[in-house]
Amino acid sequence: MVNIPKTRNTFCKKCKGYSAHKVSQAKKSKDNPRAQGNRRYARKQRGYGGQTKPILRRKAKVTKKLVLNLECTKCKFSHQKPLKRAKHVIFGGERKRKGEALVY
């Protein structure tokens, strides 16, 4: 489980300096039906001959890579930062303290 703070002080390309950024998780955008791969696939599928490419039957990965959206609080410019793989992500959760008693 990964706990990420909701704000992060990092470099902004537009402001050309360090400033606070609002952190959120990037979502997958809608596929473009006119992308080169889709155009090629549609062309290949036309006519006789059935299915031309293998249909993926099983997933290879269990998790997805975490991508952060970082939005500058000064100029509202947004950029993305990829992180490692994680199953569970929490934004702004409680931080662990050293030597604190366990609460059940």
From Swiss-Prot:
Record region (Disordered): 22-56
Source domain of life: Eukaryota
Keywords per UniProt: Ribonucleoprotein, Ribosomal protein
GO molecular function: structural constituent of ribosome
GO biological process, one term: translation
InterPro entries documented for this protein: Ribosomal_eL44, Ribosomal_LSU_eL42, Ribosomal_zn-bd
Entry keyword annotation includes Ribonucleoprotein: yes
Residue ranges of the TM segments: none
Pfam families referenced in this protein's UniProt entry, alphabetically: Ribosomal_L44
GO CC, any one term: ribosome
Keyword set includes Repressor: no
Family assignment from sequence similarity: Belongs to the eukaryotic ribosomal protein eL42 family.
Protein name: Large ribosomal subunit protein eL42
Species the sequence originates in: Encephalitozoon cuniculi (strain GB-M1)
